[in-house]
């Protein structure tokens, strides 16, 4: 299957443990991503593989289910609720310790095909997901800085 992919990388002045603590609070993404109006767990499990959250962004409701849970290293989840022609996307966060904190990579994959309509839809969806990734990485960096100040005070 062809996949449309996008990734971005940022550095955060916080340990992988501290960054993971933010990502691992899976249902609470609305607390640090301003474009998300609401998020909540829709499974009993709020962490680990299988944990599922509902995310409300404007008029769109997404359901995100954890598929990879490697503490302080990698978190991946599927995203359902986009237009049917787009299908199910996958977002992966990767954390790598660095001399100045943590290097964070967020990548998104969306199914594509040789069909021009599906390829166009995947490209447009990936553009929106790229914008969302910028909001999420900015929010993650700000949340890590806020929590770091709380710890040092």
Explain the meaning of each model-derived region.
Residues 16, 59, 88, 126-129, ...:
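A structural signal for well-ordered alpha-helical scaffolds and beta->alpha junctions
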Residues 32, 86-88, 115-118:
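Alpha-helix N-cap/helix-start motif
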Residues 51-55:
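Short aromatic-glycine motifs in intrinsically disordered, low-complexity regions
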Residues 56-105, 109-112:
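Hydrophobic-ligand binding "helix-grip"
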Residues 109-153:
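A conserved amphipathic terminal alpha-helix motif
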Residues 35-36, 45-49, 73-79:
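Short Pro/Gly-enriched beta-strand edge/turn motifs at strand-loop
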Residues 1-43, 153:
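Hydrophobic ligand-binding cavity/cleft-lining segments
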């Amino acid at each position: 299957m062809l996949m449309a992919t996008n990734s971005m990388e940022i550095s955060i002045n916080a340990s992988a443990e501290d960054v993971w603590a933010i990502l691992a609070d899976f249902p609470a993404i609305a607390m640090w991503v301003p474009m998300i109006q609401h998020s909540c767990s829709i499974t009993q499990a709020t962490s680990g593989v299988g944990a599922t959250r509902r995310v409300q962004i404007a008029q769109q409701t997404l359901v995100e289910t954890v598929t990879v849970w490697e503490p302080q290293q990698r978190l991946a989840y599927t995203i359902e609720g986009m237009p049917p022609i787009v299908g199910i996307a996958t977002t992966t966060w990767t954390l790598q310790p660095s001399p100045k904190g943590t290097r964070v990579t967020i990548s998104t994959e969306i199914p594509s095909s040789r069909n021009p309509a599906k390829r166009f839809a995947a490209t447009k969806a990936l553009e929106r997901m790229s914008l969302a990734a910028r909001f999420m990485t900015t929010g993650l960096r700000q949340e890590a800085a806020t929590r770091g100040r709380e710890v040092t005070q």
